[in-house]
């Protein structure tokens, strides 16, 4: 009988918890779960393939000791812990995967991966992550590319406040993507655009949405597509009116300069929800056989139960994407050394994976961007 492959997971929040459930259900992985919070770790039930370790990630020596001997470390922590975890993975020589959307953190991972003997694969979630894989797949079908617009959103099914929003994932991550510069391509040149700008609209299944620039979701596609496309952008999907309120909070009230306060305000006033939907909307236009063609990928993914526990759509999609990449790495289906970008991953391989199948539920769009 094959022994389970040892994996270290750092971060026992909602995404980390979902990753644990998905991997344990297979019986193929043994897990060391590391988190600084005893209260958070106490919620996990005993399992023969699960080892719980309470450890502050910032204690580098102890972190490296906890990570040593594992096939890979999966980081489901806030973006500001990425660098210390990635550096520890390099030191102990294990593979490294994370969910970060932060540009600076990813640049750090890219740099240290140059000397790595293992694989360093950041941005393994939904966006960046799956969105890059599906966008590259569509783009490969064109002879000449004109424009690419990538849109992703995790939204409440039943919005009931003036923000038309509920907290469905990391508050730190939301604030970061609303504040930091956004990499995009305009007129064939890579530029930095302001977050919350370039407001656009589209409809899907009879429901209207707004989209606007946010940071990080584009991943490494701006580099991969350099010189190949005239226009490339990544935008977040929200219900109409959300963007204007966030601009008021961040810019007019200057909470962009007081992010800890904004986080406190949001977490005390905006409820979380498990009743959410993840929207993925990618539109590519360009030439095929000398004809100008537009191709759109549209998908809605809903919350579901995993091991009898209801998980939100953003938890399911984010955790499943990382687990799929781990599986592909373990099976030798993607590069096993150096810096690995998401768009190198074959879409068919991803969707054929036991975890990636969650993305196979596709709903054709009944509207189009305008």
Task: Walk through the language-model features, giving the residues of each.
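C-terminal catalytic/substrate-binding lobe primarily of soluble NAD(P)-dependent oxidoreductases
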Residues: 4, 141-370
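Conserved Rossmann-fold cofactor-binding substructure of NAD(P)-dependent oxidoreductases
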Residues: 57-69
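Beta-loop-alpha module in the N-terminal Rossmann-like domain of NAD(P)-dependent dehydrogenases
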Residues: 72-88, 102-105
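Conserved N-terminal Rossmann-fold NAD(P)-binding element of oxidoreductases
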Residues: 7-11
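N-terminal Rossmann-like NAD(P) cofactor-binding module of classical short-chain dehydrogenase/reductase
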Residues: 67-76, 96-98
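Helix N-cap at the beta1-alpha1 junction of Rossmann-like dinucleotide-binding domains, i.e.
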Residues: 37-40, 103
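Rossmann-fold NAD(P)-binding glycine/threonine-rich loop
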Residues: 99-122
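Hydrophobic/small residue at the entry helix of a nucleotide-binding pocket
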Residues: 15
């Amino acid at each position: 009988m094959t022994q389970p492959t040892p994996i270290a997971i750092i971060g026992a929040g909602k995404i980390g918890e979902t990753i644990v459930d998905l991997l344990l259900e297979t019986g193929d992985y043994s897990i060391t779960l590391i988190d600084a919070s005893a209260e958070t770790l106490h919620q996990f039930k005993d399992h023969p393939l699960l080892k719980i370790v309470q450890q502050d990630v910032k204690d580098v020596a102890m972190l490296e000791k906890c990570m040593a001997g594992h096939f890979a470390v999966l980081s489901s922590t806030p973006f500001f812990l990425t660098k210390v975890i990635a550096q520890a993975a390099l030191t102990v020589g294990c593979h490294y995967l994370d969910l970060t959307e932060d540009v600076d953190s990813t640049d750090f991972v890219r740099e240290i991966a140059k000397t790595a003997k293992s694989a360093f694969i950041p941005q393994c979630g939904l966006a960046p992550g799956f969105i890059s894989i599906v966008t590259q797949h569509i783009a490969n079908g064109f002879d000449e590319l004109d424009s690419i617009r990538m849109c992703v959103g995790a939204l409440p099914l039943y919005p009931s406040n003036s923000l038309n929003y509920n907290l469905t994932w990391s508050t730190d991550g939301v604030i970061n993507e609303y504040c930091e510069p956004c990499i995009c391509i305009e007129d064939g040149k890579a530029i930095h655009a302001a977050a919350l700008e370039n407001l656009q609209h589209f409809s899907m299944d009879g429901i209207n949405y707004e989209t606007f620039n946010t940071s990080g979701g584009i991943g490494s596609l701006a580099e991969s597509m350099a010189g190949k496309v005239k226009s490339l952008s990544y935008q977040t999907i929200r219900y109409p009116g959300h963007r204007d309120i966030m601009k008021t909070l961040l810019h007019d009230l200057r909470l962009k300069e007081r992010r800890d306060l904004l986080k406190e305000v949001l977490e005390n006033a905006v409820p979380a929800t498990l009743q959410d939907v993840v929207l993925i909307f990618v539109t590519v236009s360009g030439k095929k056989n000398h004809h100008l063609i537009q191709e759109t990928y549209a998908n809605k993914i809903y919350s579901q139960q995993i091991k009898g526990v209801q998980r939100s759509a953003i938890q399911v999609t984010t955790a499943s994407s990382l687990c799929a990449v781990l599986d592909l790495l373990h099976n030798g289906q993607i590069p096993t050394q150096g810096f690995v970008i998401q768009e190198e991953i074959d879409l068919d391989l991803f969707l054929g994976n036991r975890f990636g199948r969650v993305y196979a539920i596709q709903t054709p769009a009944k509207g189009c961007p305008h």
